[in-house]
């Protein structure tokens, strides 16, 4: 599966419902209709997109938007970012402050396991999980940030800061 096919699948469920749960239910139906090879390829693309977004700059944006962001929260944030679609995802990976134009990013842990769950249900094979979900990178790409350095955060993420933190200063 190439990126174009992956993003087409994500876009196909974007219009279904208002909540992330409704969108995931729609995505699950699309995944159920796929052959096993495509399920595996879809999961590989999820993992690829998660790693591509594993960046300190994006983590800083998530920290501002969520009022703090642990490792696990950042993982779920990145999954939610994927569910926002190709344009939002790609813009945020390059320039995280563009998320000021997007609004809330729902944490979306279920996306990380959905294709594996469909595969397991179909094949009664839980070993599929062992193939995926390994963090290949020890640390995110880019320069780390000090979550308490408000001057840096305000400078690096001016639009997000204005929306989420301006009242704090």
Model-identified regions with their sequence ranges:
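Short, hydrophobic/amphipathic alpha-helical patches that form generic packing surfaces
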Residues: 7-12, 44-48, 52, 72-86, ...
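An exposed acidic His-Trp-rich patch
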Residues: 88-121
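N-terminal, charge-rich interaction modules
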Residues: 1-29, 34, 167
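Long, solvent-exposed, polar/charged low-complexity segments
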Residues: 7-8, 13, 126-169
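Hydrophobic/aromatic-rich, well-ordered segments within soluble, folded domains that form packed cores
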Residues: 63-93, 99
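A glycine-rich, hydrophobic loop/mini-helix early in the fold
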Residues: 29-68
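Residue-level detector of well-ordered alpha-helical segments, enriched
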Residues: 2-5, 22-26, 38, 42, ...
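Terminal interaction module
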Residues: 82, 110, 119, 152-157, ...
